[in-house]
């Protein structure tokens, strides 16, 4: 349902800044040792962070725009393990099929995301009865089903500030066995909905869909809570998060009847007013998405633990080729007027993971493209109880062994390692 947003430019704008990477830590703050789990980065405004944190944990209700179909009622409901902002227990459900050899997300039945809950009859205004209807499970026509766990958000503000060129340079340096034939296969450029006109290298989400945390938040607000939003980004109207999701069922009734959204300029009076305000450049109105983005942007990375392998695990990590995608690069960026160094152990690129890929993509994607998954950062893995994109295991050895496609060589190296070598590697991972 509708929630009107006018993006606060200073908060929502993608804060990419000068930075880079190095093999050794410099004199900047080691971001992953400077705070406890769930704390803010050094230099963060404490009052703003507390307000944003409260908004992230706030339970939405119908009057806030919740629904009519949704998966949870707050950001914190899906991001709370260890501390607010962490991994969640929920597994998002995706589906689709292949039509003439390419992916079809079955948009006519609300695909490719299935929302688990619906508001049966909500009256948002006099004379309007919003009916979400009953979902069909599985959705008609679906032949591909996948689960995706909710990812932790610790340290993502630092990731947002990694320069595009740094990620592109990592991609260019990787061998074809890891990146495929073309570097362009790995990199997705996003012109964000809340940062219109700023095209950057995407780095968030299992499929690397978003480059900015504002878009990451706006996407979740719509697809996980059913709260539609519009934005005034650089004075332009952005409508991509302004359309209600369809219920996951077939036929003309799949359209959510009577549920107002912001998608029809000149017909929806509220939308027309928003369009006029956007033309006037109204950007200084606080909104939920800005708070969500501020909270994630200023969360410190998960603190590192003690490496009980005495350094042997990192050596084994590199020997087995894990560092091909989970790069050991130390990135250095500026935030809150300070310089931070951090090791997320990810190249923030997508790779063809073969049988491990979830098979979900955009309409028209080839099967190979649907197998591409973003390299999940390993920092904070010691706080997670679900591994791989669908949380199929909590066992690190099993997760390594399940790597396929462009990760198969590392899985093979792990399988052929001695018991002592494997133990050293697992001890190292348990320190991250």
Describe the function of each predicted region:
Residues 1-8:
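Bacterial N-terminal signal peptides that target proteins for export
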């Amino acid at each position: 349902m509708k929630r009107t947003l006018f993006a606060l430019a200073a908060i929502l704008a993608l804060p990419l800044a000068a930075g880079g990477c190095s093999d050794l830590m410099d004199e900047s703050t080691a971001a992953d040792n400077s705070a406890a789990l769930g704390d803010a980065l050094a230099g963060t405004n404490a009052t703003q962070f507390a307000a944003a944190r409260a908004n992230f944990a706030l339970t939405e209700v119908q009057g806030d725009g919740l629904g009519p179909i949704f998966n949870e009622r707050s950001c914190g409901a899906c991001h709370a393990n260890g501390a607010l902002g962490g991994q969640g227990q929920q597994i998002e459900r995706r589906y689709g099929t292949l039509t003439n050899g390419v992916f079809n997300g079955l948009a006519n039945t609300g695909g490719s995301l299935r929302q688990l809950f619906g508001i049966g009859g909500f009256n948002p205004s006099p004379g309007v009865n919003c009916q979400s209807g009953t979902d069909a499970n599985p959705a008609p026509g679906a032949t591909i089903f996948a689960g995706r766990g909710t990812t932790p958000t610790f340290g993502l503000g630092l990731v947002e500030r990694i320069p595009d060129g740094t990620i592109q340079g990592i991609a260019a340096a990787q061998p074809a066995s890891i990146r495929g034939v073309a570097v362009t296969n790995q990199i997705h450029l996003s012109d964000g909905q809340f940062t219109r006109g700023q095209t950057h290298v995407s780095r968030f989400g299992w499929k690397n869909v978003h480059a900015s945390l504002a878009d990451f938040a706006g996407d979740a607000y719509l697809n996980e809570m059913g709260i539609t939003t519009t934005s005034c980004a650089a004075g332009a109207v952005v409508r991509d998060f302004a359309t209600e999701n369809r219920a996951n069922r077939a036929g003309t009734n799949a359209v959510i009847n009577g549920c107002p959204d912001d998608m029809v300029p000149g017909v929806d009076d509220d939308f027309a007013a928003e369009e006029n305000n956007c033309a006037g450049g109204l950007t200084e109105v606080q909104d939920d998405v800005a708070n969500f983005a501020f909270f994630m942007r200023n969360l410190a990375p998960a603190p590192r633990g003690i490496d009980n392998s005495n350094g042997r695990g990192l050596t084994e990590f590199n020997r087995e080729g894990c560092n091909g995608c989970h790069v050991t690069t130390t990135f250095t960026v500026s935030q809150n007027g300070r310089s931070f160094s951090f090791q997320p152990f990810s190249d923030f690129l997508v790779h063809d993971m073969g049988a491990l890929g979830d098979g979900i993509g955009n309409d028209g994607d080839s099967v190979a493209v649907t197998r591409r998954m973003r390299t999940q950062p390993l920092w904070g893995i010691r706080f997670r109880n679900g591994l791989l994109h669908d949380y199929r295991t909590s066992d690190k050895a099993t997760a390594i062994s399940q790597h396929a496609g462009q990760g198969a060589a590392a899985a093979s190296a792990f399988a052929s390692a001695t018991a002592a070598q494997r133990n050293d590697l697992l001890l190292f991972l348990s320190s991250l």
